[in-house]
């Protein structure tokens, strides 16, 4: 039976207005829209009155409900029948944890009530299309239609392909019907293999073969033999990449054979809990560094949010599945798309060349894609710390004559670093009889054929297959799986994982054969043991779907009870689906039909399939010299600062958590004004050291339209000039990931790809001492479509994205572009040696030109000398600032440095030649250093010692004030206010935020950037930051116990434990499953802290599902109530823990006036470094801190304080229960965005109880208790930041 329960409004007022505007633009006469959530409960037995009331309360979440009279035509959007949404699985979990076992399943839809003039049936179809994602959702016309969500279909049988009867044609037909993307020689191979086996292939076997042997999975082009201009080439592309490792194997522990590469890290204290006692402690050992960068281009073109989200999720799984299990740590992201053409903000260089129907626009990609990637990282709990964004779309005269070049098929880059134990770097042996396990969520009928689909140019496959090949995301599930992997590797020698791979392209059909084959075994599997949410799926769909958040593992049979225990504690689903066999054979049995859908020797599937040969011709681009007739420097500056590649990226940065882990030493946002211009990202290796890891990106794709090899060399060079900002030491410590994107088969591109790979693999990297131990290729970067009577193609430039990774010797020495106004000198290091080439620059692009000669690496020895000199200067603390020269040239380098420093610049460029335009806008390698005036001679002397004398030019200095002045021999070349330039640079991000988020918030933020008087973040302390008030108590040797409480989806518990540990506590890991299972009680704890994250993925309201699992479970409710009523206890709730505890008001004495925390006013997840003041309150944790004003990490989507009415707010204030408030940079309490990131009234962001024993706050003090973890801080802070005082106060209070 199904029960229907109404929920809260689903759309904010500004979202409704945006939707109405979209309908008007499509000429659909819709006058009004109201949308609310509707819940559907599938019951196996009726609920009694008490249970009914409990369910009703469970489904009351989000902003307070206001009465609304429903009017208009109903369009009900629900998940697709036959699927179970991530929301459903988590909401059902919560219901069961609350004791409501009569509920088989909860599901949620959005009921849209549309008031419109008379619309035709076709127009109503258009309206419906605007309201749902056809990939994951459907539209019903009545609420009762939702019963279809709970219909269980009968399993479908396997089907065979009549090869023996119909011959080769049967395979050709199956190839088209199933979208297998098989080549002619592969069809021949399969015909021969199955004829030899004497039987017809099943569809599942062909599908499995196609996925496992797709270009996406097998990298056929990179392993191919090459003939160029009639001459056979000596090496494959992959062999040239491997040459970098053969030349420089230093520090590499694993390359080319696992899900990620591994290099040597630092010996530090890794902090985690003991399996038996739950007690957190430091474990001194090497934290080796793993690195991986993926792309997810095809799915992002079809459906950007899930495409980018699952791209990030897949790369995170690659990291976790390295060796015998590893820990993902920090991420990077990148996007290349065609022109944005923001409505009302179109730029002079943006022409509309059309696009295929099946893919979305560049604007859609950049609106939804970054949100999807960020949301996955946020919910998983991985900070996203660096990235790139390029737009390019133009008709150009390139290698193949005049043609359209751009990124209709986008690049969506997802990468990152992690850490791994030394004894887990290499995978173990799979013993015969080992249990073969799928860890993670159930199989669902989504993401079919992703590997094959990604291997085709867009437009070659059927549109329905394109949509079928996109996956969907459930990051909270992936977090649960990662917690299991963490528990395994933390066991050290007792790690039960022998072998692990992630499930990606091709689903289990690729992952399981790869697992057993890599382990030298075969596998015997049972299809129906695979967890599945859709009973009607065929064997092909169960085995080959690409449902996300899954891993395949081999675990020895005697270790299965331990593995089971770990999974149950973390609530991570798993299934044993087979056994490892001695014979390298793959068999899959189907219990339901008692047949054998797969019965193949592994060498048929993964053996010597036909090798590709590429026979290609070279084409050379001539280019045309830049026509500069109508270009003025003033206009060029304005245009270049509006090019999205150059323009401010705040809209891409603040949506992503940049502080989770408490180990982020350098994020994108720089200085007191938080300007996104950092050259590289830096993390600490641990919570007890200054060793670290760095990441940077280099990419100069448009240059490939003139010179393939130069583009590749520049990508390496740019990654190097970016990462040189931190203290690494030996250049051989730097390892690169190379991600190659090309339109294989397009005239000239294959030979160009070979040139580019050779340039870096055989020449530049070996000469520099750099290794490329990891990478990926995407060889189908072209879209085709019909525009009227014309067949069109959009081909991307050959695109190499280099990501550089390195061990850092001291994270405190990292430089930023933030200028200082003390007596200083600005020096240009011009590695272009005066060439000043303007081909394929931002300047050329904004004037719709390509130019002829591009930048290049002019002198490899000088590039190496630059890096070595920088390392000496960084270590000696001789530099005040550094910023590389890249897109937009020297002009943009200087402008961004001035923005970060909120100061003026006075420079003279006479020494750079008479061509001022070329001097300011060329994109040759190099950058600007700022030194103290007194150090200038010594720095120039040192640079000369490293062979850079002819590259160094004194420019001028940074000055206090607002003027940005460039002269040549004292004649003004360009002069403007820095604030004006800052506003120009910010307009793209402003317009994107207005479109995507609450426009009122976007306007407020843009206005703040135009305020030259803004003093920036600043600190006022009412206490001595260096006084350790907990020291006397620590000296006694007594360590009170704090329960570090987490629920599934919580991700900030480790740094929280570390902060309490430092203050003298024994931090104990307590999962809600421990409390619900009765394994742990709260009676032995002196303090309790509820940590941040996304419990249950914020399903049923942020923190609300977690709270209700406490309130509706009598025994656990009693545990909490007893704890809160016990004297001499302390409790802290942070972020998700704050939201959760605000819903436990009925259990916490003195909390009756606490507010609720609901969706941010911006309607967006906000990651900010915000200024707060400590107010007078009873809070015992904030004693002695009143009046202090300091920045703190903020990361939440639902942090806005909601009170019942004005009287409620007044009572909260008058009782003195407000503990922290947001203030602006002038020190005034504020409700203005973004100083107040969520719109809370009177800046309220923390409250306490009347006795001060329980304090809850939305910001994260635990993430910034170390000074190095603060995005900006005063120079005189030592190891501990002021926020450490909270935790020491806790220790002091307990005596």
UniProtKB/Swiss-Prot annotation:
Pathway(s) per entry: Purine metabolism; IMP biosynthesis via de novo pathway; 5-amino-1-(5-phospho-D-ribosyl)imidazole from N(2)-formyl-N(1)-(5-phospho-D-ribosyl)glycinamide: step 1/2
Organism encoding this protein: Salmonella typhi
Residues binding ATP, per UniProt: 307-318, 386-388, 678, 886
Annotated keywords: ATP-binding, Cytoplasm, Glutamine amidotransferase, Ligase, Magnesium, Metal-binding, Nucleotide-binding, Purine biosynthesis
Catalytically driven reaction(s): N(2)-formyl-N(1)-(5-phospho-beta-D-ribosyl)glycinamide + L-glutamine + ATP + H2O = 2-formamido-N(1)-(5-O-phospho-beta-D-ribosyl)acetamidine + L-glutamate + ADP + phosphate + H(+)
Name of the featured protein: Phosphoribosylformylglycinamidine synthase
Binding of Mg(2+), residues: 679, 718, 722, 884
Lineage: superkingdom: Bacteria
């Amino acid at each position: 039976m199904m029960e229907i329960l109404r929920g809260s409004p689903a759309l904010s007022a500004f979202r409704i207005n945006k939707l109405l505007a979209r309908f008007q633009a499509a000429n659909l006469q819709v006058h009004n829209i109201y949308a609310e959530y509707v819940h559907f409960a599938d019951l196996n037995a009726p609920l009694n009155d008490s249970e009914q009331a409990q369910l009703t309360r469970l489904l009351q979440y989000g902003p307070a409900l206001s009465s609304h009279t429903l009017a208009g035509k109903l369009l009900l959007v629900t998940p697709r029948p036959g699927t179970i949404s991530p929301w459903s699985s988590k909401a059902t979990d919560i219901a069961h944890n609350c004791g409501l076992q009569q509920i088989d399943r909860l599901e949620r839809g959005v009921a849209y009530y549309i008031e419109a003039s008379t619309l035709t049936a076709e127009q109503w179809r258009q309206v419906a299309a605007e309201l749902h994602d056809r990939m994951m959702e459907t539209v019903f016309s009545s609420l009762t239609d939702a019963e279809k969500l709970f219909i269980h279909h009968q399993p479908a049988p396997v089907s065979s392909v009549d090869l023996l009867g119909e011959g080769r044609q049967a395979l050709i037909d199956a190839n088209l019907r199933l979208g297998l993307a098989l080549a002619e020689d592969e069809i021949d191979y399969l015909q021969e293999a199955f004829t030899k086996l004497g039987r017809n292939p099943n569809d599942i076997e062909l599908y499995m073969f196609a996925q496992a042997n797709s270009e996406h999975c097998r990298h056929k082009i990179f392993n191919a033999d090459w003939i160029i201009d009639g001459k056979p080439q000596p090496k494959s592309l992959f062999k040239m990449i491997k040459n970098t490792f053969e030349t420089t194997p230093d520090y590499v522990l694993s390359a080319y054979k696992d899900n990620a590469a591994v290099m040597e890290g630092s010996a530090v204290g890794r902090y985690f809990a003991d399996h038996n006692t739950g007690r957190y402690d430091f474990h001194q050992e090497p934290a080796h560094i793993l690195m991986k960068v993926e792309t997810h281009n095809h799915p992002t073109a079809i459906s950007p949010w899930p495409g980018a989200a699952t791209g990030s999720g897949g790369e995170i799984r690659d990291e976790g599945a390295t060796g015998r299990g590893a820990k993902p740590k920090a991420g990077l992201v990148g996007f290349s798309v065609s022109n944005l053409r923001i409505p009302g903000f179109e730029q002079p260089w943006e022409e509309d060349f059309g696009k295929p129907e099946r893919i979305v626009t560049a604007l859609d990609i950049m609106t939804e894609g970054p949100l999807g990637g960020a949301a996955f990282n946020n919910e998983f709990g991985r900070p996203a710390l660096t990235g790139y964004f390029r737009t390019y779309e133009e008709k150009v005269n390139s290698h193949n004559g005049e043609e359209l070049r751009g990124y209709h098929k986008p690049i969506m880059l997802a990468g990152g670093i992690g850490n791994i134990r030394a004894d887990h770097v290499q995978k173990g042996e799979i013993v015969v009889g080992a249990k073969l396990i799928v860890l993670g969520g159930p199989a669902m009928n989504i993401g079919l054929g992703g590997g094959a689909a990604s291997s085709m140019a867009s437009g070659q496959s059927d549109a329905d297959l394109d949509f079928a090949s996109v996956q969907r995301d459930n990051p909270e599930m992936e977090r649960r799986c990662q917690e299991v992997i963490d528990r395994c590797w933390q066991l050290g020698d007792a790690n039960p994982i022998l072998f692990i791979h992630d499930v990606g392209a091709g689903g289990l059909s690729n992952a399981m054969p790869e697992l057993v084959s890599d382990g030298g075994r075969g596998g015997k599997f049972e299809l129906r043991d695979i967890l599945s949410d859709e009973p009607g799926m065929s064997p092909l769909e169960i085995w080959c779907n690409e449902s996300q958040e899954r891993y395949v593992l081999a675990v020895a049979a005697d270790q299965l009870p331990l593995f089971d225990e770990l999974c149950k504690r973390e609530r991570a689903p798993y299934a044993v689906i087979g056994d490892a066999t001695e014979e390298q054979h793959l068999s899959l049995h189907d219990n339901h039909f008692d047949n054998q859908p797969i019965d193949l020797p592994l060498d048929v599937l993964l053996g010597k399939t036909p090798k590709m040969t590429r026979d290609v011709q070279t084409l050379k681009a001539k280019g045309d010299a830049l026509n500069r007739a109508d270009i003025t420097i003033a206009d060029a500056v304005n245009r270049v600062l509006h090019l999205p590649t150059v323009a401010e990226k705040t809209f891409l940065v603040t949506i992503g958590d940049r502080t989770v882990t408490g180990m982020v030493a350098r994020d994108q946002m720089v200085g007191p004004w938080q300007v996104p211009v950092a050259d590289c990202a830096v993390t600490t290796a641990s919570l007890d050291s200054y060793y670290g890891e760095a990441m940077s990106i280099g990419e100069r794709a448009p240059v490939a339209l003139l010179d393939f090899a130069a583009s590749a060399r520049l990508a390496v060079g740019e990654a190097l000039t970016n990462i040189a900002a931190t203290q690494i030491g030996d250049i051989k410590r730097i390892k690169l990931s190379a991600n190659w994107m090309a339109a294989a088969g397009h005239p000239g591109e294959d030979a160009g790809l070979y040139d580019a790979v050779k340039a870096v693999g055989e020449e530049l990297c070996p000469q520099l001492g750099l290794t490329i131990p990891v990478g990926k290729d995407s060889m189908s970067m072209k879209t085709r479509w019909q525009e009227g009577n014309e067949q069109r193609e959009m081909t991307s430039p050959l695109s190499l994205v280099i990501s550089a990774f390195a061990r850092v010797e001291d994270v405190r020495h990292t430089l930023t572009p933030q200028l200082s106004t003390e007596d200083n000198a600005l020096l240009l290091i011009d590695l272009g040696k005066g060439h000043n080439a303007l081909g394929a620059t931002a300047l050329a692009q904004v004037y719709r030109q390509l130019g002829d000669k591009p930048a290049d690496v002019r002198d490899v020895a000088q590039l190496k000398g630059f890096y070595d000199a920088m390392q000496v200067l960084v270590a000696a603390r001789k530099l005040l600032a550094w910023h590389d020269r890249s897109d937009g040239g020297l002009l943009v380098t200087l402008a961004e440095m001035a923005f970060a420093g909120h100061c003026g610049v006075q420079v003279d460029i006479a020494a750079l030649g008479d061509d001022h335009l070329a001097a300011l806008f060329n994109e040759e390698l190099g950058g600007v250093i700022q030194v103290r005036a007194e150090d200038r001679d010594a720095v120039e002397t040192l640079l000369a010692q490293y062979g850079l004398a002819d590259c160094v030019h004194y420019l001028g200095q940074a000055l206090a004030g607002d003027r940005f002045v460039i002269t040549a021999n004292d004649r003004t070349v360009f002069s403007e206010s820095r604030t004006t330039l800052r506003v120009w640079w910010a307009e793209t991000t402003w317009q994107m935020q207005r479109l995507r988020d609450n426009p009122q918030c976007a306007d407020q933020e843009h206005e703040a950037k135009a305020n030259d008087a803004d003093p920036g973040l600043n600190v006022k302390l009412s206490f001595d930051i260096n006084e350790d008030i907990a020291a006397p108590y620590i000296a006694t040797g007594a360590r009170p116990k704090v329960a570090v409480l987490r629920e599934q989806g919580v991700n900030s518990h480790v740094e929280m434990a570390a902060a309490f540990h430092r203050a003298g506590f024994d931090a104990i890991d307590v999962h809600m499953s421990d409390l619900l299972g009765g394994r742990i009680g709260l009676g032995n704890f002196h303090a309790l802290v509820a940590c941040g994250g996304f419990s249950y993925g914020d399903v049923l309201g942020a923190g609300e599902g977690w709270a209700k699992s406490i309130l509706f479970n009598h025994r656990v409710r009693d545990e909490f109530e007893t704890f809160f009523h016990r004297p001499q206890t302390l409790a802290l709730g942070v972020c998700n823990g704050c939201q959760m505890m605000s819903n436990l008001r009925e259990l916490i004495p003195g909390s009756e006036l606490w507010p609720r925390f609901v969706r941010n006013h911006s309607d967006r997840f906000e990651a900010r470094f915000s200024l707060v003041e400590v107010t007078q309150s009873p809070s015992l944790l904030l004693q002695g801190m009143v009046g202090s004003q300091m920045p703190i990490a903020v990361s939440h989507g639902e942090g806005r304080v909601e009170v019942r009415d004005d009287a409620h707010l007044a009572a909260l204030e008058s009782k003195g229960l407000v503990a922290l408030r947001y203030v602006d940079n002038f020190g005034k309490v504020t409700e203005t965005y973004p100083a107040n990131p969520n719109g809370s009234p009177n800046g309220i962001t923390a409250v306490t109880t009347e006795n001060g024993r329980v304090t809850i706050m939305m910001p994260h003090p635990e993430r910034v208790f170390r000074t190095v973890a603060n995005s900006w801080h005063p120079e005189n802070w030592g190891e501990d930041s002021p926020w450490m005082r909270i935790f020491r106060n806790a220790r002091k209070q307990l005596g």
